């Protein structure tokens, strides 16, 4: 017998403003509980030290979370100069202290080194896995694991301010970029060492900063719903962004209602105006109802790749 699903079938994306000191999984579980959702997943972990944007997908939106994992990110980071730690952040042990002695011109030259396409060796204190185990577990045991450099892109690296021994930067980068590693490498280039003392993710893909909500915000709404004897969804669900915002950068193909049945059966259908092997958003009818993503085959057919489950009352007969 199949296990009964617990929680509501609620679909959408919450832009959580994660607090410092908590894991991304803890934040995910709290959001899932607040919404009483039957399924939830986040779109790229933030370190416990870090705060900021953590998109959390609920219900059918989890099918598209990988596309947010692959999206560009933006961070505001403050580094403490003159001190290097074994984790490249303030959670680690100090391994070296040095005097700070560089000019603004030398700083700008160093920053330029990180802009554009580069190769980065991931930190040992990362969630990347080696033989099924996260690197940070090896690091905590004092074991150094060989890591290959990986290609990253830093689209923007902007100097914000330098106050005393604290340097603040704004970084727009590709997926898989480790800000702690950039900070540590920058400190070495400046000859003084550095580590992260504040890290805030300010953007994922094109999601708006002002749409973020904190766990405290959500908890307050849950309490309000209980006090007013309302269903929690009446106050929380309006905060959800549509699930197709996870693939908003994909081209759209709008199909007539008559094709809905065939698409939902996973059948390839005739379509035009699409490039071959490019993922697209599939919408149906005049209301442009999102039903999933597909790809154009070289035989001129649009093949569904990932489809949502449509409620029974909306399913085609």
UniProtKB/Swiss-Prot annotation:
SUPFAM superfamilies: Pseudouridine synthase (SSF55120), PUA domain-like (SSF88697). The active site is at 47 (nucleophile). Its EC number is 5.4.99.25. Coiled coil: none annotated. It catalyses: uridine(55) in tRNA = pseudouridine(55) in tRNA. GO terms for molecular function: RNA binding; tRNA pseudouridine(55) synthase activity. It is an enzyme of class 5 (isomerase). Keywords: Isomerase, tRNA processing. InterPro entries: PsdUridine_synth_cat_dom_sf, PsdUridine_synth_N, PUA-like_sf, PUA_sf, tRNA_psdUridine_synth_TruB, tRNA_sdUridine_synth_fam1_C, TruB_C. It holds the Pfam family TruB_N. Belongs to the pseudouridine synthase TruB family. Type 1 subfamily. HAMAP family: TruB_bact. Responsible for synthesis of pseudouridine from uracil-55 in the psi GC loop of transfer RNAs. This is tRNA pseudouridine synthase B. The lineage of its organism: Bacteria, Pseudomonadati, Pseudomonadota, Gammaproteobacteria, Alteromonadales.
């Amino acid at each position: 017998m199949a296990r009964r699903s617990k929680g509501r079938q609620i679909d959408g994306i919450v832009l959580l403003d994660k607090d410092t000191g908590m894991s991304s999984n803890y934040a995910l579980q709290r959001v899932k509980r607040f919404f009483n959702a039957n399924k939830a997943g986040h779109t790229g972990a933030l370190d416990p030290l870090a705060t900021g944007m953590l998109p959390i997908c609920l219900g059918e939106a989890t099918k598209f979370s990988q596309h947010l994992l692959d999206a560009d990110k933006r961070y505001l980071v403050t580094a403490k100069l003159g001190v290097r730690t074994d984790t490249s952040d303030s959670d680690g042990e100090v391994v070296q202290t040095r005097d700070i002695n560089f000019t603004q011109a030398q700083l700008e030259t160093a920053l330029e080194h990180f802009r554009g396409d580069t190769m980065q060796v991931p930190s040992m204190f990362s969630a990347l896995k080696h033989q099924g185990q996260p690197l940070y577990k090896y690091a905590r045991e004092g074991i150094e694991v060989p890591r290959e450099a990986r290609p990253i892109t830093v689209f923007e690296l902007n100097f914000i301010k330098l106050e005393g021994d604290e340097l603040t930067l704004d970084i727009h980068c590709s997926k898989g970029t480790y800000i702690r590693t950039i900070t540590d490498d920058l400190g070495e280039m400046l000859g003084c060492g550095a580590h992260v003392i504040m890290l805030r993710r300010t953007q994922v893909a094109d999601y708006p900063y002002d749409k973020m909500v904190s766990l405290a915000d959500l908890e307050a709404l849950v309490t309000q719903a209980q006090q007013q004897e309302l269903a929690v969804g009446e106050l929380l669900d309006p905060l959800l962004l549509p699930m197709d915002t996870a693939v908003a950068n994909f081209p759209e193909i709008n199909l007539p209602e008559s094709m809905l049945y065939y698409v939902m059966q996973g059948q390839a259908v005739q379509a035009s105006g699409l490039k071959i092997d490019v993922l697209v958003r599939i919408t149906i009818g005049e209301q442009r109802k999102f039903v999933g993503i597909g790809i154009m085959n070289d035989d001129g057919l649009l093949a569904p790749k990932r489809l949502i489950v449509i409620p029974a009352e909306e399913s085609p007969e």
